[in-house]
Amino acid sequence: FTLVCASGNVINAIFDRHIDAMHATHLIIPKYFSLKFSWMLYVGFITLGAAISFYLAYRTHQIILWWFYPICVFLLWIYSYKLKCFPLLGNILVATFTGLAMLFIPFAFRENMSELRWMDYPLWAQLNYRFVMLGIFAVLCNLCRELCKDLEDFIPDSSQFCESTAVYYGISTTKFMTVFCLIALS
């Protein structure tokens, strides 16, 4: 999962290099890495991640689970390439992807959770409820973060014709969405 996130950060930096050029503090490419090296790093992360995920799927006799990896890589790529400039949808995708990462915990222990369901149903239900609530909390926190980033990048996004949430709906409406998410968190 870490390599998927790392590759997502690299591909996002590649596609955002023109927008990031307007914010000297956000500039990664070409300030620290060349474009060629960034593409090589992206391919390296994806290749290594694919090999590790295939190995783990093979070792656990769950080859079908390997398909989660290319789906996640594709979603992060399509976000960086297109959905970042698609109002709210890109924010929701990244917030969901990031926020639901902790649901890998009950998924990894699904056999134990299945046994627990039959041994102590109230405890099983309570654990599931807590994981779901934690997932919702994390998604909302990350959605607030994504909306704040859109507000921060309003000028560079609008100058590059990137219709982020803040550009499309305006600063006031995006601030209202952010406050609404924060209220929902409380």
Q: What is each PLM-predicted segment?
A:
Residues 57-60, 80-89:
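Membrane-interface helix caps and helix-loop-helix hairpins in membrane proteins
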Residues 31, 92-110, 166-171:
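Small-residue-rich segments of transmembrane alpha-helices in multi-pass membrane proteins
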Residues 41-43, 86, 90-95:
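Membrane-interface loop-to-helix entry segments
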Residues 46, 81, 99-100, 113-186:
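C-terminal membrane-associated helical module and adjoining short loops/tails
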Residues 13-17, 87-92, 110-119, 151-155:
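A cytosolic-side transmembrane-helix exit/cap motif
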Residues 1-15, 49-50, 63-77, 123-148:
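Membrane-embedded alpha-helical segments that form the functional core of polytopic membrane enzymes
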Residues 17-63, 69, 161-186:
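Multi-pass membrane catalytic core of lipid/isoprenoid biosynthesis enzymes
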Residues 49-57, 76-80, 101-109:
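Structural signal for membrane-spanning alpha-helices in multi-pass inner-membrane proteins
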